[in-house]
Amino acid sequence: MHIKLANPRGFCAGVDRAIEIVNRALEVFGPPIYVRHEVVHNKFVVEDLRARGAVFVEELDQVPDDVIVIFSAHGVSKAVRDEAARRGLKVFDATCPLVTKVHMEVVRYSREGRECILIGHEGHPEVEGTMGQYDASNGGAIYLVEDEADVAELQVRNPDNLAFVTQTTLSMDDTSKVIDALRSKFPAIGGPRKDDICYATQNRQDAVKQLASECDVLLVVGSPNSSNSNRLRELAERMGTPAYLIDGAEDLKHEWFEGVKGIGITAGASAPEVLVRGVVEQLRAWGAAGETELDGRPENITFSMPKELRVKAL
């Protein structure tokens, strides 16, 4: 068996920044540091931060007064921000700047009085945060669609004053079909100046397409609640390559590799490289020989830290 590694894989700039915000807050202010929702969707990362003093909660009513709160990389609604401000909580915002970009688009559409359609997965925290940016007090509305069937059933108030945005971690192929359906049904619909699906999601999906065409089985290192990790698994399966979403080496099963010559490995944007190395080591122990990494698109993007948490230059 030969191992091929996707490139790029694993942490993106938004995840790096979110984790570093929690780490720096713990260093500067000491525990406990409260984090609304898992800062990123990865069990290993969350457990590591919890061991260092981060306290993960789902709602602000679980947060005592006079503590530091961090908003997760997925973003929050205006109502959550307003509640934190009302209570005077000290907040550090780890929302990915590319999610914030989508939030600003929704706010702009709301101010313009345009109805808005969000393409995304119901119940995902990013979707909840984005939906919560829209102010319907001016008579507008925001709608959520997941697929072409939802578009077929959707009724809006004014199809001539309409715009769409998307969740940042969707399948590019699936989303393009939904956008085509929206444009067909609502010819006047507007959209973002630039694709809302983030660069890291696009790059990792492109890498999986290449990897799935060259391997007999694909492993995606990522947690079950990670949207972008699930999309990677689905993409490989759609190409006819058996694919498995795993938290780490402990999830591997011998029977997946019977008669297999090429094993592809990638990792979702929330999964650290240490988990990938653990998978590689386990496969080597089971007889895998050789390891290559695909040529990939370089990722040089970084996002700035909140001023109060920046490391001072020596």
UniProtKB/Swiss-Prot annotation:
Top-rank taxon: Bacteria
Positions with a binding annotation for isopentenyl diphosphate: H41, H74, H124, S226, S227, N228, S270
Reactions catalysed: isopentenyl diphosphate + 2 oxidized [2Fe-2S]-[ferredoxin] + H2O = (2E)-4-hydroxy-3-methylbut-2-enyl diphosphate + 2 reduced [2Fe-2S]-[ferredoxin] + 2 H(+); dimethylallyl diphosphate + 2 oxidized [2Fe-2S]-[ferredoxin] + H2O = (2E)-4-hydroxy-3-methylbut-2-enyl diphosphate + 2 reduced [2Fe-2S]-[ferredoxin] + 2 H(+)
Cofactor(s) this protein requires: [4Fe-4S] cluster
Keywords of the record: 4Fe-4S, Iron, Iron-sulfur, Isoprene biosynthesis, Metal-binding, Oxidoreductase
Residue positions binding (2E)-4-hydroxy-3-methylbut-2-enyl diphosphate: H41, H74, H124, T168, S226, S227, N228, S270
Residues holding dimethylallyl diphosphate: H41, H74, H124, S226, S227, N228, S270
Enzyme class (EC, first level): oxidoreductase
Residues annotated to bind [4Fe-4S] cluster: C12, C96, C198
Protein name as annotated: 4-hydroxy-3-methylbut-2-enyl diphosphate reductase
Biological source species: Ectopseudomonas mendocina (strain ymp)
